[in-house]
Curated annotation (Swiss-Prot):
This is Large ribosomal subunit protein bL31B. NCBIfam families: L31 (TIGR00105), PRK01678.1 (NF002462). It comes from Streptococcus equi subsp. zooepidemicus (strain H70). The gene is rpmE2. Pfam families: Ribosomal_L31. Part of the 50S ribosomal subunit. Keywords: Ribonucleoprotein, Ribosomal protein. Gene3D superfamilies: Ribosomal protein L31.
Length: 86
């Protein structure tokens, strides 16, 4: 096995710039910034979106109803739903 071909894997603090949420994780991401977190100094990586601010994880997701081809055809030609007439 060759030596010195793998990047340095170490603990890094990620900072969500949207909410200010910080979390510690292992990463190979390099950073010149450092931060004090839980009494230790770690490299700091700033991210725009994390699980603290992403709409999927926060529940603020907007769902859109995708109409099917039949529904679009019926809307286009003004046809009523056959099941609704019964």
């Amino acid at each position: 096995m060759r030596k010195d071909i793998h990047p340095d894997y170490r603990p890094v603090v990620f900072l969500d710039t949207t909410t200010g949420y910080k979390f510690l994780s292992g990463s190979t991401k390099a950073s010149k910034e450092t931060i004090e977190f839980e009494g230790e100094t770690y490299p700091l990586v700033r991210v725009e979106i994390s699980s603290d601010s992403h709409p999927f994880y926060t529940g603020r997701q907007k769902f859109t109803q995708a109409d099917g081809r039949v529904d679009r055809f019926n809307k286009k030609y003004g046809l009523k739903d056959a099941n609704a007439a019964k």
